[in-house]
Every structure is written in C-alpha cells, then in structure tokens.
Amino acid sequence: MPSYDPPLRPPKQARSQRTLDRISQASLELMEEGGVESATVAAIVERAETSVGSFYARFSGKDDLIRYLQDRIWSEARNRWDAALAGQDWGALSIESVVEGVVTLLLRSFRADYHQREVLGRERRQDEEGARRVFEFHQHILATVTPLFLAHQKEITHPDPEWAIRLGYRFAVGAIREILELEEAVGVVDGAATADGLIPELARAWIAYLGAGGPDPASAGSGEVDFFDPWG
C-alpha cells in the first residue's frame, strides 16, 4: 500500500489548536445537519467564529478538511478503545465475560461516532485512504482483543481459535453496524431488536462458534461486569 501523508501537522501553539478545534467542530456540526455539501467554507468559518484566512492557513480546501476530520475521528476512536480496554482487569474474567465485554465495547465504539463516520464516509467510502483508515482500525481492535480470547485457549474447542476469533469479530461488527443503520434510519421500533439487546445474543453466538463456555452458552450476557466507558 502506498505511503500516506497526513493532511495537517498538529499546531504547536495553544491558540492555533483552539482555532483548529473550532473549525473541526463547526464542520462536523454542519455536515451532520445538512450533509457534506452544506459545510461550505463560509458557513464553517462563520460558525467557528474565525476567518477564511484561518481556514486556508490550515487546509487547502474542503477535501483536505474532510481527510483531516476522517483521520481525527478514527484516531480518537482508537484512543478511546485503548482506554476502555486498559480500564478493565481482563485476566480476572471468565471467557463468557470477556466475549460479552468485547461486544459491549464494540457497540459503544461504533455508536459513539456513528453518524459522523457515515456522513464523512459517504464522501470518500470507495477511495484508498478511506479503506486504509477502516482496515487499520479493525486490525488494531483485533490485535488487542485476540490475546484476551487466547488467554482462555484451553476452553476453546474450535480447531483454529484465531480464525474463530477473527470471523466472530466480523460477524459481531456486521450485526452491530446493521442494527445501528436501522436505528439511524427509523429509530427504535417497538418489538424490534435493539442494539443494546443484541449484546448478549452476539456474545452467545460468538462463544458457541469458539466452542467455549461449557455446555450452557446461555450463561453469556449476564452483564455482571461494569466496563469503563470512555464514550460517556
């Protein structure tokens, strides 16, 4: 894969950082309200209470801004994920609780910036940079959760535990993404599955695929662990 240069170097001065933060926040708000097209440079600087010159001192144009916002959102998501993992003593948990915890954190992670990712993603979903961001984020999550699962490898009866972890991850992420898309489109429908209600079901399915958890996989999803939540 070709090398990639970030669209912006971090500001060295606090004042410059505050201006950048205001531009970023204003841009995201406008894009969430009316799509990428509504976030014109004029509208962005007006809401950010800054100048057109300040915008172009940082970005060559809106395409450059979008690249920066995408990098920022995925980087912050990765940092919050790492903080959530670090906030739990995973070694003290059963494999059922580990799986449930990972699914819980996946839902919180994807839900936190879901709309922003979707708004920005529609603009560049098929390009190489967008694919790189998504790939690297998921690879990072898999690299961090695989050791948590393999700490219970003796309980996993699947002939290829690492493959079962990867495929189970894709299954869980796909289900979470689908239900978040549904909730975004039509809201929470009475009688329909909710994203939070999906957690124990995905945990049971993943545990069953791993061949772990003893004869009663229904013990998953008990919710006895209160996981640290950096998403608020």
Residue locations for each model-derived region?
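N-terminal intrinsically disordered/low-complexity leader segments
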Residues: 1-18, 185-188, 214-232
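Hydrophobic alpha-helical connector segments
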Residues: 68, 82-111, 165-168, 199
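Hydrophobic alpha-helical bundle segments that form small-molecule/ligand-binding pockets
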Residues: 83-92, 112, 117-118, 125-128, ...
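Generic hydrophobic, amphipathic alpha-helix propensity
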Residues: 15-27, 44, 69-81
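Hydrophobic/aromatic-rich alpha-helical bundle segments in the mid-to-C-terminal region
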Residues: 118, 131, 151-203, 213-225
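Short hydrophobic clusters on alpha-helical segments that form packing/core surfaces
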Residues: 23-31, 77, 106, 172, ...
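Amphipathic, non-transmembrane alpha-helical scaffold segments
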Residues: 16, 20, 66, 70, ...
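Helix-turn-helix
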Residues: 22, 30-64, 68
